[in-house]
């Protein structure tokens, strides 16, 4: 069985350390721990790394389409590699959770996260796994757009990093046992 883990974010140095790029940051760490490198797959508008874990093929994907169009990369990759959406996991930032909190879900709506909304639209299904990494709500007077495109302040940086570590630990556990429900039970 082939699995795909997607990290959502925005491409480019300008966005590298922003809250909206928690999915990219977590996927970069997972790739480092699995000792794989990304290469650009232009037809799929993505950076893709592949390896085998416990005898199963694994693709790690960073869409280069910008957050709100992520599904334009993910759907064609699923189709090309014949991966069922139940074997897709998407890691992303979550406004509705405190900074650094990690929540895993098996399916559901976008919850207002535009990258997830795009994946649902293009894949045509809500039945894929999610790893939500909390970035908290905007402080008083700040718009959601400015909040997600800003970096973490010093007091939240370490907490956010801990969330990334926990998300990666959850994915490694999932890859070892192949059971997302079991992973949810352990990490939620």
Curated annotation (Swiss-Prot):
Coiled coil: none annotated. Disulfide bonds: none annotated. The keyword Transcription does not apply. It is an enzyme of class 3 (hydrolase). It holds the Pfam family Pept_tRNA_hydro. HAMAP family: Pept_tRNA_hydro_bact. It is found in: Cytoplasm. This is Peptidyl-tRNA hydrolase. SUPFAM superfamilies: Peptidyl-tRNA hydrolase-like. GO terms for cellular component: cytoplasm. Its main location: cytoplasm. InterPro entries: Pept_tRNA_hydro, Pept_tRNA_hydro_CS, Pept_tRNA_hydro_sf. GO terms for biological process: protein quality control for misfolded or incompletely synthesized proteins; rescue of stalled ribosome. TRNA binds at residues 15, 66, 68, 114. It comes from Lactococcus lactis subsp. lactis (strain IL1403) (Streptococcus lactis). The active site is at residue 20. Keywords: Cytoplasm, Hydrolase, RNA-binding, tRNA-binding. Hydrolyzes ribosome-free peptidyl-tRNAs (with 1 or more amino acids incorporated), which drop off the ribosome during protein synthesis, or as a result of ribosome stalling. The record marks 93 as: Stabilizes the basic form of H active site to accept a proton.
């Amino acid at each position: 069985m082939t699995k795909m883990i997607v990290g959502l974010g925005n491409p480019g140095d300008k966005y590298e350390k922003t809250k909206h790029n928690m999915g990219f940051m977590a996927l970069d760490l997972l790739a480092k721990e699995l000792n794989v490198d990304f290469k650009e797959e232009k037809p799929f508008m993505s950076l893709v790394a592949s390896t085998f874990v416990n005898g199963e093929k694994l693709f790690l994907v960073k869409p280069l389409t910008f957050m709100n169009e992520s599904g334009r990369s993910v759907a064609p990759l699923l189709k090309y590699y014949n991966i069922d959406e139940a074997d897709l996991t998407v890691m992303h930032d979550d406004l509705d959770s405190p900074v650094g909190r990690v929540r895993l879900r098996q399916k559901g709506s976008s919850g207002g996260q535009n990258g997830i909304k795009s994946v649902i639209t293009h894949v045509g299904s809500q039945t894929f796994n999610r790893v939500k990494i909390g970035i908290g709500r905007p402080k008083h007077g700040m718009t959601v757009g400015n909040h997600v495109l800003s970096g973490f302040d010093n007091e939240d940086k370490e907490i956010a990093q801990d969330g990334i570590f926990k998300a990666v630990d959850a994915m490694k556990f999932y890859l070892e046992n192949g059971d997302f429900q079991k992973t949810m039970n352990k990490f939620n």
